[in-house]
UniProtKB/Swiss-Prot annotation:
The lineage of its organism: Eukaryota, Metazoa, Ecdysozoa, Arthropoda, Hexapoda. Its main location: cytoplasm. It is found in: Cytoplasm; Mitochondrion intermembrane space. Residues 4-132 are annotated as: N-terminal SAM-like domain. Keywords: 2Fe-2S, 4Fe-4S, Cytoplasm, Iron, Iron-sulfur, Metal-binding, Mitochondrion. This is Anamorsin homolog.
Length: 254
């Protein structure tokens, strides 16, 4: 009876036939000041219609291995209330495991196969708000401007550009290639230097590819020219005179 205190509401559950020992235990409970006792048979407790969290203590003379009974009694006691099982046939380890699975905490075993389980300090299905953010420190408004503050210096947009910045650039001033002294186009040249150098290269190739006379008599006329002479069919010309040959004349007949 050490589990029952003054002003407690107690549910006493008996199993089998009522004996003199049961009557004595109930009378001892009623002798405690302001203790209200409800006596119920184990086969009827689930049908009695008790409200959840109605009792402070439940004294159950029933097998503790009954999972359905243990879960039902857990609902009947108030948070932090206790359910005391007295089961002579119980196995200590099996009883402890069953009470844990039913939702009890702080399970203890006493002499005489008595097992005590406590209901957690909350109701089934209850919720609690978790404060994970903590106290957020106030951040100084560094970029906040006061429109009424005349001490703030503002930049004049007209002073951002000089007169030199307003002059329209020319193609030569925008050219990046060849500014280091050596005329060399960049990899992705877009200023026109690459095309200019390519044209110069082709011009020098044409100049170097001008045919030269091996016999030295080409200028005299066809009578003195070889069968493969590029000047064949052309009139005689002065020695050293520059003669422009067409593409067809530069190709071999065979």
């Amino acid at each position: 009876m050490n589990f029952v205190q003054e002003n407690n509401h107690v549910l006493y559950i008996w199993n089998g036939a009522i004996s003199g020992e049961i009557e004595q235990e109930v009378n001892r409970l009623k002798a405690i000041p302001n203790v209200q006792v409800n006596v119920e048979n184990a086969d009827r407790v689930l049908l009695a219609g008790y409200t959840p969290s109605q009792f402070d203590v439940v004294l159950a003379n029933v097998p503790s291995g009954n999972s359905e009974m243990a879960s039902s009694l857990l609902k009947l006691v108030k948070p932090k209330g206790k359910v005391v099982f007295k089961d002579d046939s119980a196995n200590a380890e099996a009883t402890r495991s069953n009470l844990l699975l039913s939702g009890f905490i702080n399970i203890t075993s006493l002499d005489g196969n008595v097992f005590v389980g406590e209901k957690p300090n909350y109701e089934i299905g209850s919720a609690a708000k978790l404060s994970l953010g903590g106290n957020k420190a106030k951040v100084a408004a560094v970029w906040k401007l006061d429109v009424d503050d005349d001490d703030d210096e503002r930049i004049d947009e007209d002073e951002l550009l000089d007169e030199e910045d307003k002059v329209k650039p020319t193609a030569e001033s925008l050219r990046v290639c060849g500014t280091t002294g050596k005329r060399k186009a960049c990899k992705d040249c877009s200023c026109g230097l690459a095309e200019e150098l390519e044209a110069e290269t082709k011009g020098s190739a044409v100049a170097n590819s001008e045919p030269k006379s091996s016999c030295g008599s080409c200028y005299l006329g066809d009578a003195f020219r070889c069968a493969t002479c590029p000047y064949l069919g052309m009139p005689a010309f002065k020695p050293g005179e520059k003669i422009q040959l067409t593409d067809t004349q530069m190709r071999a007949d065979i």
